[in-house]
């Protein structure tokens, strides 16, 4: 029997082998810890992070609201960098809760998945 972490890592590597970010369509990777949420827009061909946002230093609010704010922030930063379309990498997490909030807020902010 595998633990939740082992399951997530197995899914993460399986998906990572199938998707890759390019300069025209970079990968938007989400990492979720118990207290914070981090999002990066990554060009895998050059190995560079094009935009990043996190909930570090934000005012105290419920985690889902924090995730939505981070989604709006990454959409704004990505558009400033000239990025309109991304490949969404949920990093092995279920598409539910905070991960879904980040994705929905980024879509509402103007990013296309």
From Swiss-Prot:
It holds the Pfam family Ribosomal_L18p. SUPFAM superfamilies: Translational machinery components. InterPro entries: Ribosomal_uL18_bac-type (IPR004389), Ribosomal_uL18_bac/euk (IPR005484). GO terms for molecular function: 5S rRNA binding; structural constituent of ribosome. Keywords: Ribonucleoprotein, Ribosomal protein, RNA-binding, rRNA-binding. It comes from the Bacteria. One of its GO terms (biological process) is translation. GO terms for cellular component: cytosolic large ribosomal subunit. The keyword Ribosomal protein applies. HAMAP family: Ribosomal_uL18_B. This is one of the proteins that bind and probably mediate the attachment of the 5S RNA into the large ribosomal subunit, where it forms part of the central protuberance. Part of the 50S ribosomal subunit; part of the 5S rRNA/L5/L18/L25 subcomplex. Contacts the 5S and 23S rRNAs. Belongs to the universal ribosomal protein uL18 family. This is Large ribosomal subunit protein uL18. It comes from Phocaeicola vulgatus (strain ATCC 8482 / DSM 1447 / JCM 5826 / CCUG 4940 / NBRC 14291 / NCTC 11154) (Bacteroides vulgatus). The lineage of its organism: Bacteria, Pseudomonadati, Bacteroidota, Bacteroidia, Bacteroidales.
